[in-house]
Each structure stands twice: as structure tokens, then as C-alpha cells.
Regions:
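Active-/binding-site microenvironments in catalytic and ligand-binding cores
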Residues: 22-321
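Hydrophobic alpha-helical segments
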Residues: 9-10, 90
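Bacterial N-terminal signal peptides that target proteins for export
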Residues: 1-9
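Bacterial N-terminal signal peptides
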Residues: 10-18
Length: 321
């Protein structure tokens, strides 16, 4: 008989026991933002008409276009079915990055790293790839202190609010060292910076608070390097990382050295080739910090299983005992 990890057994028990018996002992937290949707443009049905939002939808920061939703009907004698067609980018909203999302060239592929054609894509992920024990890193207090210098509002100018890699307002090597004893096979590191509050604040990458001219918290290069050092030393591979920013990396690590993305996306370059997965644009991570013991929480990533997919919008849950 196969020996399943404890977090798998916990989740299996949750799914099998009726809610009337389990809800009193478990807390479920939705870590996903809603996906705003728009009617299609008359000129191009693949593009959103931002003047025609559904309900209270507003545009969100994204590397793809806004989500397009159009409807057809299937009539019956008693009424009809609404049938929606949804057009959106894989890496839009709260979403999963599979290990195959980044394709390393020969200069960035490291010993022990897998070539892109050897990594799992969306349809190749099994259930154990999408669940895991939660390990919390909470830097929201440091972020709040920095934002207080500007009335709680992020500024793209690091002289006003500083989220550069050399600041103490991003996840650094010391934060990773602090959780070293919890780094193990299959765990998911969850990084709460409190940044999701700015998610619906606009789509201009240079000016609006969420991207903030790539001056935002996340993992700096030293944190990524320390995580790999610890995994290699212990001979383990974490399941993934969840963060409430647009891309796991700090803004400075994401944008790199210049406007040509030189030495950019450090976490993506080094971790995805090892098989680590990412959940980006997460929501409500602060709620996890308020449970009695976040170490008793598990992550569930409800990712799509489309063939050749490099990721996908996901309903992500934390289930806490």
C-alpha cells in the first residue's frame, strides 16, 4: 500500500467527511481574486470592450488582455440555457505557473535543472502537484511601515517608498533561513505582503500602485538563492510558492537590469527549471496569518488541465485545521 503524506490524508479526509461534521474543525479561505469580464469588442471578438463591463468589473494588471465573455443560448420548451464563451490569458488573475512556463536557454539551465521539454505542463500535473502543507512568510508589517512614509500609498520612486532588493521591505535570505526547518518535499511557501489591497487600482505598469513601476515587494535574488541552497542541502523540493504580487519576484528582480529584461525574473529562471510551481496574484493571504496555527493549513490549487498549458487561472484555497 502506498504511504501518502500527511497533508494528502488531511485533504482526503476533508473531502470525504460531510461538511456538517468537518466545518466546525476546519477553516477554508479563498485565496483567489474574482476575474473581471467584459463584452467582446465589435471590431475584434477576441478583445474586450472596456466600456462594456459585466456587473462591477474593472480592468486589472495583466500581461495579456482583459477577459472577454460572450453568451449564446440553448432554448428549451421551458426557457433556455445561457452558454458563455470565455477568452483570457493563461497567466491572468490569480493563476498557476507550471514548471514549463519559463524556457531556459543554455546559459541559464543549471546542473540538476530540467530542459523545458522535460518539465510538467498543465495536463501533466497530478493531484499531489496541486496540494501541499503551507509554510508562511509574513512581511506585511514591514511593508506597512514603509508605506506609512507616504500615507499608505506606494510610490514608484524608491526614495519615497523603497521596495528594492537591498531594502528590508522584500523577502530576503533571512526570511528563508527563518523557515529552514519547515522546508520539505511538497510544501508550499506562502508570502503575505499585504499587497493584494492594490490589485484593483489600475493597469498602468509605470504608475498604478499594484505594479508601481516595478517597485513592489516579493522575493529578492538572495532569497531565491538561499531557498535553492537549503533545498539542495536537505535534498528536498518544495511544491510551490504563493504570493500576493504579480510574479513572485520583487519588482526589481522581475524587471532586471534594463528595459530589455536583462537578468530579469530571477525566481522564474532558477526555480521553475527545478520543478517548483508558482501561484501569482493571490488574495486574502492575511487571513491565513489570523488562524490559530498557520502550520496546520494546506494549499489546494484548482488549476485547469488543458493540454500543452503553461499555467492557468485558478481557484486557490487554504484549508486549515
Amino acid at each position: 500500500m502506498r504511504n501518502y503524506p500527511a497533508h494528502v490524508l488531511t485533504l482526503a479526509a476533508f473531502l470525504l467527511i460531510p461538511l456538517s461534521e468537518s466545518s466546525a474543525d476546519m477553516i477554508t479561505i479563498d485565496l483567489s481574486h474574482p476575474i473581471p469580464t467584459f463584452a467582446p469588442s465589435e471590431d475584434d471578438p477576441m478583445k474586450a470592450d472596456l466600456s462594456k463591463p459585466y456587473l462591477d468589473s474593472v480592468p486589472i494588471p495583466t500581461f495579456g488582455g482583459q477577459a472577454v465573455l460572450s453568451f449564446g443560448t440553448f432554448p428549451t420548451s421551458d426557457g433556455h440555457f445561457d452558454l458563455g464563451t470565455l477568452v483570457l490569458s493563461e497567466h491572468h488573475g490569480t493563476h498557476l505557473d507550471t514548471p514549463g512556463h519559463y524556457v531556459n536557454d543554455v546559459t541559464s539551465l543549471e546542473p540538476g535543472g530540467k530542459r523545458a521539454n522535460e518539465r510538467k505542463l498543465a495536463h501533466q500535473l497530478d493531484a499531489s502537484d496541486l496540494i501541499g502543507k503551507l509554510v508562511m512568510i509574513d512581511i506585511s508589517g514591514r511593508v506597512d511601515t514603509e508605506l506609512a512614509k507616504n500615507g499608505g500609498v506606494p510610490s514608484p520612486d524608491i526614495n519615497v517608498t523603497d521596495f528594492s532588493n537591498s531594502s528590508n521591505n522584500v523577502v530576503g535570505a533571512d526570511d528563508i533561513t527563518a523557515i529552514e526547518s519547515k522546508i520539505d518535499n511538497g510544501v508550499w511557501i506562502v508570502i503575505n505582503s499585504g499587497w493584494s489591497r492594490f490589485y484593483f487600482s489600475g493597469t498602468d505598469f509605470a504608475k498604478d500602485p499594484y505594479i508601481n513601476g516595478f517597485n513592489h515587494p516579493g522575493m529578492n535574488k538572495a532569497a531565491v538563492d538561499k531557498l535553492i541552497e537549503i533545498m539542495d542541502k536537505k535534498g528536498v523540493l518544495i511544491g510551490g510558492i504563493v504570493a500576493d504580487n504579480i510574479g513572485i519576484d520583487s519588482g526589481q528582480s522581475a524587471v532586471g537590469d534594463d528595459d530589455k529584461w536583462t537578468n530579469s525574473w530571477h525566481a522564474h529562471v532558477r526555480l521553475l527549471q527545478r520543478g517548483v510551481k508558482f501561484v501569482e496574484n493571490a488574495a486574502n493571504l492575511g487571513q491565513i496569518t489570523m488562524v490559530a496555527n498557520p502550520d496546520n493549513c494546506n494549499i489546494v490549487v484548482g488549476a485547469p488541465k488543458h493540454v500543452r498549458g503553461t499555467g492557468g487561472p485558478s481557484r486557490v484555497l487554504a484549508i486549515c485545521n
